[in-house]
Curated annotation (Swiss-Prot):
Present in testis (at protein level). Not detected in other tissues tested. Keywords: Cytoplasm. One of its GO terms (molecular function) is DNA binding. One of its GO terms (cellular component) is nucleus. It is found in: Cytoplasm. Belongs to the histone H2B family. This is Histone H2B variant L1. It comes from Mus musculus. May act as an acrosome-nuclear docking protein in sperm. It comes from the Eukaryota. The gene is H2bl1.
Length: 123
């Protein structure tokens, strides 16, 4: 039986497009964590137009948002496994939010989240 031969292609870096050279530009993409600094600034400008926020505060808010999302995802997966299902449903996520957040904040989060999903689907 003959050995399969693979062509090795050598590319010179200057001939590659800049998009392909910048693979490890942002380490948060590789870790699966989002960077919400742009959205934090947009919400701040919408709520208080003439105020700013330091980059250190934005980093703290970013860590807080990533932590909350991770906790919600973990709790929703536990709910999914408790019900012995393989599909994560919006009900699992809503129940995880109700378990993790205080009562009033959880109802507001579920309400606004449902509205946002509805607008996204029907736009």
């Amino acid at each position: 039986m003959a050995k399969p031969t693979f062509k090795r292609q050598c590319y010179i870096k200057r001939h590659l497009r800049p998009l392909y050279r910048k693979h490890s530009r942002c380490s948060s993409i590789n870790l699966g964590h989002g960077n919400y600094s742009l959205y934090i600034n947009r919400v701040l400008k919408e709520v208080v137009p003439n105020r700013g926020i330091s980059s250190y505060s934005v980093d703290i808010m970013n860590i807080l948002i990533n932590d909350i999302f991770e906790r919600i995802a973990t709790e929703a997966c536990q709910q999914m496994f408790l019900r012995k299902r393989c599909t994560l449903t919006p009900g699992d996520i809503q129940q995880a939010v109700h378990l993790l957040l205080p009562k009033k904040l959880a109802t507001l989060a579920v309400t606004f989240g449902s509205k946002a999903v509805h607008r996204f689907i029907h736009s």
